[in-house]
Amino acid sequence: MKITKLEKKKRLYLMELDNGDKCYITEDTIVRFMLSRDKVISEEELKEIQDFAQFSYGKNLALYHLSFKARTEKEVREYLKKYDIDKNIVSQVIANLKEDKWINDGQYAYAIINTNQLSGDKGPYVLTQKLAQKGISKSTIEENLKEFDFSEVAQRVANKLLKKYEGKLPARALQDKIIQNLTNKGFSYSDAKIAFDDLDSQVDQETTQELIFKELDKQYTKYARKYEGYELKQRLTQVLARKGYDFSDIASALREYL
């Protein structure tokens, strides 16, 4: 077979043969096989050219995808699937990129965890979930998590939460709110509790009294329409307890309020 045409088409070249066959190849393919117009190639050589062209095309696509930011193996595989590249060729591309250090799931996991350590707010459980969604193996995630102490991150998040809620919630509700937020962000209950205990949190009696009377004003308007006397007192006690106020503070406030 003889090559009758080699014509550039955007990123690829169109190669035509004298038997009517056509295929798109990359510039790397032309260089590797020293292709030119009128060159004679065999069926076997054509197959090699087509396979390498797909590999070269897939690698170029992957490198373009990786040029914007680091990606995991799973992310690159999914990207290449969109271009209908043969699965075997995709595996070859991935292996080549891993060999050349373009893809390294271990380094990717370390970088994500390290960035979180410096300025993030996630605990190990949420990070594990996020990295697993990226296709990183459980063993790789665990190996990298061992390199970090999350107590500083938990403390940083706890301090921010304290600034947000202090003066707005009674002591017990403040503790519950901060610990719940920390566990939602992926910290264990024990780490969340330690972070809270290390806070300089002081909800004084005056603040508690101010908060409870403010809440009573709101709840009294709601319940006084339906209840009175003992039943009203019970309803107010229940709703204030659910909001984190101690029963002794509730009883004291109700004596003054009612």
Swiss-Prot record:
Keywords: Cytoplasm. Gene3D superfamilies: Winged helix-like DNA-binding domain superfamily/Winged helix DNA-binding domain. Disulfide bonds: none annotated. Belongs to the RecX family. GO terms for biological process: regulation of DNA repair. Its main location: cytoplasm. One of its GO terms (cellular component) is cytoplasm. InterPro entries: RecX_HTH_1st (IPR053926), RecX_HTH_2nd (IPR053924), RecX_HTH_3rd (IPR053925), Regulatory_RecX (IPR003783), WH-like_DNA-bd_sf (IPR036388). The keyword Secreted does not apply. Modulates RecA activity. It comes from Streptococcus pneumoniae (strain ATCC BAA-255 / R6). The keyword Cytoplasm applies. HAMAP family: RecX. This is Regulatory protein RecX.
